[in-house]
Amino acid sequence: MASYVIEGGNSLKGEILVQGAKNEALQIISATLLTDQEVVVRNIPDILDVNNLIDLLRNMGVKVKRPTRDTCVFQADNVNLDYIKSEQFLEKSRALRGSVLLVGPLISRFGYAIFPKPGGDKIGRRRLDTHLVGIQALGATCDYHSDMQAYELTASRLSGTYMLLDEASVTGTANILMAAVLADGITTIYNAACEPYLQQLCKMLLSMGAHIEGVGSNLLRIEGVQSLHGCEHKMLPDMIEVGSFIGMAAMTASELLIKDVSVPDLGIIPASFRRLGIAVEQQGDDLFIPKQEHYEIETFMDGSIMTIADAPWPGLTPDLLSVFLVVATQAKGSVLIHQKMFESRLFFVDKLIDMGAQIILCDPHRATIIGLDKRVPLRAATMVSPDIRAGIALLIAAMSAEGTSIIHNVEQIDRGYQSIDTRLNAIGARISRL
């Protein structure tokens, strides 16, 4: 178990480039299974979750070349279906929640898929019903094997249909979409997720020869084709990393230029940080965060406490609420953080309370933060990172704290952030890896 030693109280200065989007990468890499031709993917983040998925594809027989750190060439022309049925495949899939995205391409192209009860973050229940119900509606048969704790799907041929999803699940929509592009007839998905990364998947599939209408809306119409061909695809910058860097700059009173962020795909993220009183200036496709010794949380027009809540796109991504929460601890004023889409994701606040933050955990979904206005800095502490998003929030807290903090289990941070210690040290942070 690796650890970070963080010397707090150091300001950052300079510019930082954002990595490729983790959540997009998991979808795009899975989609390379839909063709036997070469698919070139650029701006791939060099992070644990993505690399584990690439290794899983290699084990399945997919040819993978990596000419540069952020570019991969995939060719799934000799997929080993026997390996997919093996215990080793299930074991590796179980350790990687993103592996569920292989189901759509596998059932669509090969008529067979299997996946275990997944791993990933310990952030409460994350239902897979949307995936299974949608793919079954296309004609697949699903059986649960209690001895393997795995779901097995089979289909001779998928057929298009109309479906109304019970939730706008991003991975659920992606899985159904990847299954539908090779199905017979027309599939209509209503209440589809429409996040930028899902739009990117649609654009990639279109460039491979798929027929998709309604990209960017919650109503997708897919006309199945016989086969897809190769393509080249470049991934968006990671909006979660953009938000994390905004939070770091605010907490450490730093001047920071965040480069090439793809502003149109950030949605309400910059505006939400401005609600906390943080100055976020757009300069072309970059974001400039000026040095601020203090920032004040806004109130609603009636004077009531500001609420920051997650919601399906175009609402605020749930992956950034931990960053908003930690940033609010040093603001002037109070805010209610409402995590609607997952429970248990706020339980890391006890570590911030130990550091001196004033937080009331109302229930598994809500926390009220009373900002200290930087009059009382957070204290250094020794902590364990429970998941990716809490991990980055704890890192931000440690960077702003007085003294030297230690964060254990930083492999959780590695799952979503590329060489974060090296990149931050280059602009003034003092982080050592043990």
UniProtKB/Swiss-Prot annotation:
Gene Ontology terms, MF aspect: UDP-N-acetylglucosamine 1-carboxyvinyltransferase activity
Nucleotidyltransferase as UniProt keyword: no
Uppermost EC category: transferase
Active site: 121
Compartment(s) of residence: Cytoplasm
Location, primary (coarse class): cytoplasm
PANTHER family noted in UniProt: UDP-N-ACETYLGLUCOSAMINE 1-CARBOXYVINYLTRANSFERASE (PTHR43783:SF1)
Role according to the record: Cell wall formation. Adds enolpyruvyl to UDP-N-acetylglucosamine.
Annotated family: Belongs to the EPSP synthase family. MurA subfamily.
Name of the protein in its database record: UDP-N-acetylglucosamine 1-carboxyvinyltransferase
Source species of the chain: Porphyromonas gingivalis (strain ATCC BAA-308 / W83)
Gene name of this polypeptide: murA
